[in-house]
């Protein structure tokens, strides 16, 4: 399983940088910030499926 360090999150705003992450919920997150904010919101239930689009 790929690991992402989300210890610096959540952040109030994310950049528009596009570097997609595929979450365990089968959703594509546009970048690490958006993905990590979602991980924090999910209380750790969301994980990274793989890098790139789902």
Curated annotation (Swiss-Prot):
The record ties this protein, via PROSITE patterns, to: KAZAL_1 (PS00282), KAZAL_2 (PS51465)
On whether Transmembrane is a keyword of this UniProt record, the answer is: no
Which residues of this protein are annotated with the site description Reactive bond 3? 16-17
Do you know which Pfam families this protein is assigned to?
Kazal_1
Which part of the chain is the Kazal-like domain?
A: 4-54
Tell me where in or outside the cell this protein is found. Answer: Secreted
Superkingdom of source: Eukaryota
Annotated glycan sites: 43
In alphabetical order, the GO MF annotations are: serine-type endopeptidase inhibitor activity
UniProt xrefs under Gene3D superfamilies: 3.30.60.30
Q: Which cysteines are joined by disulfide bonds?
A: 6-36, 14-33, 22-54
Entry keyword annotation includes Amino-acid biosynthesis: no
- Membrane spanning stretches: none
Kindly list the GO CC terms recorded for this protein.
Answer: extracellular region
Keywords on this record?
Answer: Disulfide bond, Glycoprotein, Protease inhibitor, Repeat, Secreted, Serine protease inhibitor
**Domain statement:** Avian ovomucoid consists of three homologous, tandem Kazal family inhibitory domains.
Spell out the PANTHER family in the cross-references. OVOMUCOID-LIKE-RELATED (PTHR47729:SF1), SERINE PEPTIDASE INHIBITOR, KAZAL TYPE 2, TANDEM DUPLICATE 1-RELATED (PTHR47729)
Protein name from the UniProt record: Ovomucoid
Tell me the lineage of the source organism: Eukaryota, Metazoa, Chordata, Craniata, Vertebrata
